[in-house]
């Protein structure tokens, strides 16, 4: 109505219209994300801005390290971050059963949704009820299973670890697609639909596939060199 008032044509896609007339600074890694060749936007990719200054529960961290050091078997980390799923606990239980069968160990980051909170910890399971930053967790893992949020995807990428994504909302299916396309992990899983056999097959692939390990380590080195925070600060200063 406002555009008609001033004799302007209607806009079918406001997001595209606004982006086309602005300078777009993309806060993701060029080594993980990509751009559409059909874009007519003015854009640059500056790298992800990691925050490694989070306060955390030191006791929870020390308990996690004790669990890590208690054996030599592979470690998987699972989290849904700030997302929730009515199938989260069923999926968590399936992961525990798989870890017991194959002698893997599982760390579950319960998060806001308290995923897996009803499970009983044992030598195969550590339930992390208090938050610990990703940069202190992922270097100890052999694989990470997560919801596919941009931040978690980049944190696993920076750590140089294989990942398996269980996308739920928004951009998560995109990151799931990219991780598999780049050879950094198996094709994503739908928590609500995946059978126990499919979960087991993809978890074992995540942990044992040497190609994922090689590709993830290479990508990790490149992401660590990007300097996303410095890049965006430099970009802002150039506009002044």
Describe each PLM feature range.
Residues 1-240:
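Catalytic core of nucleotide-sugar-dependent glycosyltransferases
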């Amino acid at each position: 109505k406002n555009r008609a008032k001033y004799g302007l044509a209607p806009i079918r896609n406001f997001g595209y219209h606004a982006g086309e007339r602005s300078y777009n600074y993309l806060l993701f890694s060029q080594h993980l994300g990509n751009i559409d060749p059909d874009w007519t936007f003015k854009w640059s990719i500056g790298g992800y801005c990691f925050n490694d200054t989070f306060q955390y529960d030191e006791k929870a961290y020390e308990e996690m390290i004790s669990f890590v050091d208690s054996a030599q078997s592979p470690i998987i980390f699972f989290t849904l971050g700030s997302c929730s799923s009515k199938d989260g606990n069923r999926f968590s239980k399936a992961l525990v059963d798989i870890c017991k069968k194959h002698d893997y160990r599982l760390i579950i980051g319960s998060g806001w949704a308290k995923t897996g909170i009803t499970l009983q910890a044992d030598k195969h399971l550590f339930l992390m009820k208090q938050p610990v930053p990703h940069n202190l967790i992922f270097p100890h893992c052999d694989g990470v299973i997560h919801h596919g949020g941009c931040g978690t995807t980049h944190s696993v990428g920076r750590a140089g670890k294989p990942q398996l994504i269980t996308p739920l909302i928004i951009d998560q299916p995109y990151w799931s697609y990219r991780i598999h396309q780049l050879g950094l992990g198996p094709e994503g899983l739908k928590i609500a639909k995946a059978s126990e056999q499919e979960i087991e097959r993809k978890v074992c692939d995540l942990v044992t596939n040497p190609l994922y390990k090689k590709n993830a380590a290479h990508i990790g080195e490149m992401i660590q060199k990007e300097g996303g925070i410095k890049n965006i600060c430099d970009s802002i200063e150039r506009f002044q």
